[in-house]
């Protein structure tokens, strides 16, 4: 456990064979001052990559977000031009670039997998899906806007399985994957 906003000094054995799974982020939007997204997500990426550099770690799996695409409901692919429009989305795109620069310094030796998950749900997330479930179960649910709002999502265990699979089956260079279930359902479909 460490604070990625500062230089990472952890007292554990580290080898070049280790893998870094970088999950560190300030992510709830809205909910934080703009500066918090940049300080944690960008400075954190710098410090994680510096730690990997210092110990010769060759593999990083970075969890970004679909937020670099900006707020829109049309289908996005990994080739879609990112157009982030929130501090969170901007900070995650910059963090991706920082990780990519780390990988490019030793192109043939380092692996970088970037995953861009949608809304992640599962036990303990206490976010959108948990609130939706308890609202419906308690008979207190109401639509907080449009019924046809689309939210791309993925179950946390499926995301982890995918990351482990990619780690074992990585191609050279940088791999970038959007991680959401197909099809993305409307909030009305999820409620039903």
Task: Tell me the role of every PLM-derived stretch.
Residues 47-87:
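Conserved Rossmann-fold NAD(P)-dependent oxidoreductase catalytic core, especially the SDR/UDP-sugar
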Residues 4-43, 47, 51-54, 69:
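NAD(P)H-binding glycine-rich loop region in Rossmannoid oxidoreductase-like domains
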Residues 125-131, 145-168, 174-178:
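Substrate-positioning beta->alpha
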Residues 39, 43, 73-121, 125, ...:
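Catalytic helix-loop patch of NAD(P)-dependent Rossmann-fold dehydrogenases
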Residues 169-192:
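Mid/C-terminal beta-alpha module of Rossmann-like enzyme folds, strongest
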């Amino acid at each position: 456990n460490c604070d990625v906003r500062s230089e990472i000094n952890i007292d554990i054995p580290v080898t070049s064979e280790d893998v870094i799974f970088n999950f560190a982020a300030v992510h709830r939007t809205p909910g934080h001052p703009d500066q918090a997204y940049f300080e944690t997500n960008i400075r954190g990426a710098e410090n994680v990559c510096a730690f990997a550099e210092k110990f010769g770690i060759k593999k990083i799996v970075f969890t970004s977000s679909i937020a670099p695409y900006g707020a829109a409901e049309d289908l996005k692919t990994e080739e879609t031009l990112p157009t982030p429009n929130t501090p969170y989305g901007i900070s995650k795109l910059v963090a991706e670039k920082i990780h990519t620069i780390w990988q490019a310094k030793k192109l043939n030796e380092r692996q970088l997998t970037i995953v861009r998950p949608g809304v992640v749900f599962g036990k303990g997330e206490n976010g959108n899906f948990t609130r939706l479930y308890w609202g419906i179960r308690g008979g207190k649910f109401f639509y907080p806007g449009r019924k046809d709002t689309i939210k791309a999502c993925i179950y946390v265990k499926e995301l982890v399985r995918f990351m482990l699979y990619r780690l074992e089956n990585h191609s050279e260079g940088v791999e970038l994957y959007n991680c959401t279930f197909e099809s993305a359902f409307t909030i009305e479909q999820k409620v039903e």
